[in-house]
Amino acid sequence: MAAYKLVLIRHGESAWNLENRFSGWYDADLSPAGHEEAKRGGQALRDAGYEFDICFTSVQKRAIRTLWTVLDAIDQMWLPVVRTWRLNERHYGGLTGLNKAETAAKHGEAQVKIWRRSYDVPPPPMEPDHPFYSNISKDRRYADLTEDQLPSCESLKDTIARALPFWNEEIVPQIKEGKRVLIAAHGNSLRGIVKHLEGLSEEAIMELNLPTGIPIVYELDKNLKPIKPMQFLGDEETVRKAMEAVAAQGKAKK
């Protein structure tokens, strides 16, 4: 018997996902298709009768708007929402804004996969002359971050290292109080939570593809260990296609 339930949702497709560009900390909004994905995710939660007590998200609008859309669909827009940079997407450094397929053609698919999916290899850092440096590093939403906290690039390991303290200190106590928690975030920050929950190896987490806009349900025991595999709310075909689309992002176009 599950002691707790936890629901995660990766934001719907963003405008830069649509253009196959590395988004990272750039504040790309949802594409029209991404907005529809978020609506369908919300409808799936509504149809399954889910209610929540508190929500967590990043400070990036694609995740925030996904959460808004879900809360609208389930008619729970009044719920408290905690936003934190610690749930932001991984910072892709110097790759930010580059088209993934073009980068794969230039550097090779293997190198792009290492940058995207290796556990501890960061991409090249974002230098001050990068076209999006000021847009990100000087943004006032990050004004309270120390120099050590504000990244110029991150590996998956780095992303998990800044997300997990928030999970342990802020989210876990809410779950243990019996609060029904919804987290709307990003592929890599959510991957960190999944790795922690399931005790996955570095190799396994590299291959994990979380689909956009599809609610992921965990049933947890009193020690917050999953009692069954993650469950996707949505029809099987939609889930399969979404996961394949995520896996295809770093491949060069033929």
From Swiss-Prot:
UniProt catalytic activity: (2R)-2-phosphoglycerate = (2R)-3-phosphoglycerate; (2R)-3-phospho-glyceroyl phosphate = (2R)-2,3-bisphosphoglycerate + H(+)
GO molecular function terms listed in the Swiss-Prot or TrEMBL record: bisphosphoglycerate mutase activity; hydrolase activity; phosphoglycerate mutase activity; protein kinase binding
Positions bearing the site annotation: Transition state stabilizer: H186
N6-acetyllysine, modified sites: K106, K251, K253, K254
One GO process term, biological-process aspect: gluconeogenesis
Binding-site positions, substrate: 10-17, 23-24, 62, 89-92, 100, 116-117, 187-188
InterPro entries found in the cross-reference section: His_Pase_superF_clade-1 (IPR013078), His_PPase_superfam (IPR029033), PG/BPGM_mutase_AS (IPR001345), Phosphogly_mut1 (IPR005952)
PTM-bearing positions, type Phosphoserine: S14, S23, S31, S118
Active site: H11, E89
Organ and tissue specificity: Expressed in the liver and brain. Not found in the muscle.
Matching Pfam families: His_Phos_1
EC number: 5.4.2.11, 5.4.2.4
Cellular component per GO, a single term: extracellular exosome
Function in brief: Catalyzes the interconversion of 2-phosphoglycerate and 3-phosphoglyceratea crucial step in glycolysis, by using 2,3-bisphosphoglycerate. Also catalyzes the interconversion of (2R)-2,3-bisphosphoglycerate and (2R)-3-phospho-glyceroyl phosphate.
Assembly mode: Homodimer.
Protein name (Swiss-Prot/TrEMBL): Phosphoglycerate mutase 1
Organism, scientific name: Homo sapiens (Human)
